[in-house]
């Protein structure tokens, strides 16, 4: 898709200028995750058919400057940093919607795609049809996980109870990982004085994505990242070489004011939660720390089913513009390189693509739609310890500067949930599923036993509900599959008399006559192990 974005933007410009020539007023052009968009001022909604007449190639002469397209004196706002390219001859309008950026303004948003060849378009539309079956926004609405609302603002998600269950499971798992690695969990405020961001450098380099405001003669900023606050905790007391490494973790909410045309469900939001971690350590501790981080990251990704060729590791080295001494960069890069070699994992070296403050290791994963996503990162930082004058007392009593490592395994918790929903098509591993068992009594006569089965499961901490509706059993089974419930338990007169259950699982698997106690024990084992592969069906089937 990345290779098409220049074409899409060119197509959007062409289509917008066609509209302008027809007397319409396009005001903004940009790119979404899978298409382009054009916002048009209009007192009434354009129809799909009306908009399609503007979807054709024309070689307009225009100028792009300062984020605007200028054509015959008319200026249209251009969002994003992609360069328009190519000569798209094939257009497709995907949908049209109306939104109100303010009380007195109505805009019609047209979304579409554009390609140079019909083959490109046909291939993409086929891919898009498949992708729509796995669109996390559609799955999230169907499963009642989360929602977005005009009243709350674009890019700001509201997680519903079942969505919060998924978040809690992922956070609990990461808490266990952090505890096993010696992290101390902290909490930091969402708002800080901008003096903090000026020291860190974010005020100059990241200000366009920050929310900054004045209050009581002070300038404040909502945090786009957690690291400066963790640094202040480190600085709150004298640190000895014996204390290092010091590891802080936080499930921190951060806010980055992305352009509205770039927002896309949970994949690109303005507020999200990071599984953030920062380690302060001596240079001689860097290699062992990174080795442990790489191992744990691969373990976590594997727990979600991403392993082998579906994980790609990148080592990014020193860019032309950087801070830190040659010796520091050489030591840090060698440490990261040695770790990857000693662990015998395949990796790709990306020359000069490291951060300006240090080398890094990134982990990409491939989902069921063959898309690659950058998730986890391990970044060495020489910059912030220098800016904040961090110190520790060395063995000889001298003061030394620690190295800092930034680490996130999920990256964005929200984005990770979106990827998992699309990868599993809503059928999450049992331990992550909001509802793990749904009990289906064959008739009202079996309702008492169904309630007893549910009570036994709930007492073991298994998320269970009953569907006692008067609909047919086949309809209730289908609804359970559609809702992504891993296990449907069917109980009738025979099951009640024998203290057994009939299990219906994903893949239309049915196992009859399973003792209730065994089902509960095996399911507890599957959930407790967070095992997406060795399910109870494989053990008792």
From Swiss-Prot:
InterPro entries per UniProt: aa-tRNA-synt_IIb, aa-tRNA-synth_II, aa-tRNA-synth_II/BPL/LPL, Anticodon-bd, Anticodon-bd_dom_sf, Thr-tRNA-ligase_IIa, Thr/Ala-tRNA-synth_IIc_edit, ThrRS_anticodon
Region of interest called Catalytic, as start-end residue ranges on this chain: 135-429
Cystine bridges: none
Source domain of life: Archaea
Cofactor-binding details, from the entry: Binds 1 zinc ion per subunit.
Gene3D superfamilies for the chain: Anticodon-binding domain, Bira Bifunctional Protein, Domain 2
Residue ranges of coiled coil: none
Residues reported to bind Zn(2+): 227, 278, 406
Keyword Zinc in record: yes
Pfam families named among the record's database cross-references: HGTP_anticodon, tRNA-synt_2b
Catalytic class of the enzyme: ligase
Localisation: Cytoplasm
Function text: Catalyzes the attachment of threonine to tRNA(Thr) in a two-step reaction: L-threonine is first activated by ATP to form Thr-AMP and then transferred to the acceptor end of tRNA(Thr). Also activates L-serine and transfers it to tRNA(Thr) but cannot deacylate incorrectly charged amino acid; unlike most archaea the editing function is found in a freestanding protein.
Known partners and oligomeric status: Homodimer. Probably interacts with its editing subunit.
Similarity section: Belongs to the class-II aminoacyl-tRNA synthetase family.
Protein name (database record): Threonine--tRNA ligase catalytic subunit
Organism: Metallosphaera sedula (strain ATCC 51363 / DSM 5348 / JCM 9185 / NBRC 15509 / TH2)
Lineage, highest ranks first: Archaea, Thermoproteota, Thermoprotei, Sulfolobales, Sulfolobaceae
């Amino acid at each position: 898709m990345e290779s098409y974005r220049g074409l899409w933007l060119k197509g959007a410009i062409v289509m917008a200028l066609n509209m302008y020539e027809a007397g319409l007023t396009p005001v903004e052009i940009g790119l979404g995750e899978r298409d382009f968009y054009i916002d048009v001022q209009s007192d009434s909604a354009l129809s799909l058919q009306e908009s399609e007449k503007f979807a054709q190639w024309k070689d307009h002469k225009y100028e792009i400057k300062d984020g605007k397209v200028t054509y015959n004196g008319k200026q249209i706002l251009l969002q994003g940093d992609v360069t328009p390219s190519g000569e798209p001859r094939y257009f497709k309008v995907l949908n049209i919607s109306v939104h109100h950026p303010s009380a007195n303004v109505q805009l019609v948003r047209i979304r579409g795609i554009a390609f140079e060849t019909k083959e490109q378009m046909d291939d993409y539309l086929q891919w898009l049809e498949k992708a729509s079956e796995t669109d996390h926004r559609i799955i999230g609405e169907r499963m009642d996980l989360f929602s977005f609302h005009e009243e709350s603002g674009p890019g700001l998600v509201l997680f519903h109870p079942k969505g919060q269950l998924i978040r809690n499971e992922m956070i609990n798992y990461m808490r266990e990982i952090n505890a096993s690695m010696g992290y101390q969990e902290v909490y930091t405020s969402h708002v800080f004085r901008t003096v903090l961001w000026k020291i860190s450098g974010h005020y100059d380099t990241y200000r366009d994505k920050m929310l900054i405001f004045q209050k009581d003669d002070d300038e404040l900023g909502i945090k786009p990242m957690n690291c400066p606050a963790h640094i202040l905790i480190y600085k709150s007391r004298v640190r000895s070489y014996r204390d290092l490494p010091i590891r802080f973790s936080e499930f921190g909410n951060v806010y980055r004011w992305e352009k509205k045309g770039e927002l896309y469900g949970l994949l690109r939001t303005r507020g999200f939660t990071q599984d953030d971690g920062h380690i302060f350590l001596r240079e001689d501790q860097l290699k062992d720390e990174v080795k442990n981080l790489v191992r744990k990251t691969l373990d976590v990704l594997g727990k979600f089913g991403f392993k082998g060729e579906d994980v790609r590791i990148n080592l990014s080295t020193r860019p032309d513009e950087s801070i830190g001494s040659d010796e520091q960069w050489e030591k840090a890069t060698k440490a990261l390189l040695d770790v990857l070699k000693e662990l015998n994992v395949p990796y790709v070296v990306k020359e000069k693509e490291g951060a300006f403050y240090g080398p890094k290791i990134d982990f990409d994963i491939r989902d069921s739609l063959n898309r690659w996503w950058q998730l986890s990162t391990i970044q060495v930082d020489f910059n912030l310890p220098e800016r904040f004058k961090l110190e520790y007392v060395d063995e000889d009593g001298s003061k030394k500067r620690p190295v800092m490592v930034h680490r996130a395994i999920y990256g964005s918790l929200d984005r990770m949930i979106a990827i998992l929903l699309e990868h599993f098509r809503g059928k999450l591993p049992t331990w992550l599923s909001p509802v793990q068992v749904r009990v289906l009594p064959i008739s009202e006569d079996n309702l008492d036993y169904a309630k007893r089965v549910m009570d036994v499961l709930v007492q073991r901490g298994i998320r269970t509900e009953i569907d006692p509706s008067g609909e047919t059993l086949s309809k209730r089974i289908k609804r359970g599959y559609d809702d992504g419930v891993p296990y449907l338990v069917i109980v009738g007169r025979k099951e009640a008399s024998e203290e057994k259950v009939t299990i219906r699982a994903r893949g239309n698997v049915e196992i009859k006559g399973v003792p209730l106690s065994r089902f509960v024990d095996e399911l507890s084992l599957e959930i407790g192990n967070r095992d997406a592969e060795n399910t109870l069906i494989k053990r008792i089937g």
